[in-house]
Amino acid sequence: MAKIIKFDQEGRNAFLKGVNTLADAVKVTLGPKGRNVVIEKSFGAPLITKDGVTVAKEIELDDKFENMGAQLVKEVASKTSDVAGDGTTTATVLAQAIYRQGAKLVAAGHNPMEIKRGIDKAVETLVAELKNISKPIKDHKEIAQVGTISANNDKTIGDIIAEAMEKVGKEGVITVEEAKAMETTLETVEGMQFDRGYLSPYFVTDPERMEATLENANILIHDKKISNMKDLLPVLEQTAKSGRPLIIIAEDIEGEALATLVVNKLRGVLNICAVKAPGFGDRRKAMLEDIAVLTGGKVISEEIGFKLENTTMDMLGQAKKITVDKDNTTIIDGAGSEAEIQGRVKMIRAQIEETTSDYDREKLQERLAKLVGGVAVIKVGAATEVEMKEKKARVEDALHATRAAVDEGIVPGGGVAYLRAMSALDSLDLSTEQQFGVNVIKRALEEPIRQIAQNAGVDGSIVVDKVKNGKDAFGYNAADDEYVDMIQAGIIDPTKVSRSALQNASSIAGLMLTTEAMIADKPKEEGSMPAMPGGMGGMGGMGGMGGMM
């Protein structure tokens, strides 16, 4: 297929137009007085949102080159959302500012490669300075403040998230669901969740929610594949006699064994569910052992002399309730002894201390969370479905932000942290061309606070100037239109969010600045309309109708 190629300034101008179109739609949502964006849906009511990444994801432009620019900035928003869960609008505003300033310099004849090097060095310095400014989160109140700010100044949501974290610990599992009522509530349950769902949808007990729920269930834990029905028969017969539900967790269940379980479930002979074991290799064995300790059962493994066909009921674990959907299994209130669980926790903590691998440490912490944490469910209520979707998205954002704050600490919010970190750039000793890159970043760092002020109906330049002349956490509270100490006023951002937004924005903007040629498919030309078919006899085509008047 034929291609169109654009070079130099022509291509950059098209890029810039696309970047501006997307960023201008996203940045109206920034800050406490940011506006909503309404998105048409092909079915159902329109979606109303104030979430930057949701707006960005909906944007596709007609012009292929402009669309390239828009899609690259969309990547900034979605990457920031993936890493930090919030800060998507800030990242978009930064990307637009960096590219816009950089494109002017390139158009004036400066070297884009040197500008990019300057940008990279500036961002590296800023990230170190943000970590330096950062304070660890100390208490319930600060967690609530982070949640409140991220949920668009909704204090109720901030308080609920802080309460959830307090109940299940920062390592517990918190999920967000839609409530049937108008109120937003918190439900907490002790339990362990792992990312494996049912092996067949026929195990579902609640077709509407596509979930299998087993109460007072036995748990068979096996570390190998089960494909032969004969091995399972003894334990199934004992289960049928006991009348209790059974969940089987094994490396895999396939063929004849799975088919038999499904048939027995459909006939109502057994209330049963089958799930793949979580993890891989040695980690899978360890996780199965965790489940066994939590539920008071044993891992049926030939390595320790247990065979599947010889399994007895006392080897099975037990739990008050098990919920399985297509992606996750949650075991609530396992029957394991407290002493054994604490022994297991102690062992995992010792392994965390000893390991030198970051990856292993992360996985061990996940296992620890599943043993000591619980499961908290935030049920989001609203008057209408449209409002519920918008509110649920805000709760999810706030949840990500609070987790990020617990991970890396907090900095003053409202764009103040960027202005305070800016002083670290004065110590950089770079070539003239690279210094231009640093200047681009300096100007871009003012953009979030300028946009927050503009969305609040105030002159952004005056606010930036006043905050720059202040010290420490002094900043502009757009919600109340006053200058305050941001930390004391509870206007705080997670360091991880501020850092990720800056890193992702500068990464994509830098790549766009150093792009010299753009290639896109040539649009197909619309062929001329085919002639209309001949009319009825003697009419000489439909045009002949004119003579009939």
Swiss-Prot record:
GO cellular component: cytoplasm
Location in the cell: Cytoplasm
UniProt entry keywords in alphabetical sequence: ATP-binding, Chaperone, Cytoplasm, Isomerase, Nucleotide-binding
Gene Ontology MF, one: ATP-dependent protein folding chaperone
Reactions listed under catalytic activity: ATP + H2O + a folded polypeptide = ADP + phosphate + an unfolded polypeptide
EC number assigned by the record: 5.6.1.7
Paired cysteines (S-S): none
Primary location group: cytoplasm
Binding positions (ATP): 29-32, 50, 86-90, 414, 477-479, 493
InterPro entries xrefs: Chaperonin_Cpn60_CS, Cpn60/GroEL, Cpn60/GroEL/TCP-1, GroEL-like_apical_dom_sf, GROEL-like_equatorial_sf, TCP-1-like_intermed_sf
BP GO annotations: protein refolding
UniProt record similarity statement: Belongs to the chaperonin (HSP60) family.
Family matches, as NCBIfam families: GroEL (TIGR02348), PRK00013.1 (NF000592), PRK12849.1 (NF009487), PRK12850.1 (NF009488), PRK12851.1 (NF009489)
Subunit structure: Forms a cylinder of 14 subunits composed of two heptameric rings stacked back-to-back. Interacts with the co-chaperonin GroES.
PANTHER family per the UniProt record, alphabetical: 60 KDA HEAT SHOCK PROTEIN, MITOCHONDRIAL (PTHR45633)
Known role: Together with its co-chaperonin GroES, plays an essential role in assisting protein folding. The GroEL-GroES system forms a nano-cage that allows encapsulation of the non-native substrate proteins and provides a physical environment optimized to promote and accelerate protein folding.
Name of the protein: Chaperonin GroEL
Organism lineage string: Bacteria, Pseudomonadati, Thermodesulfobacteriota, Desulfuromonadia, Geobacterales
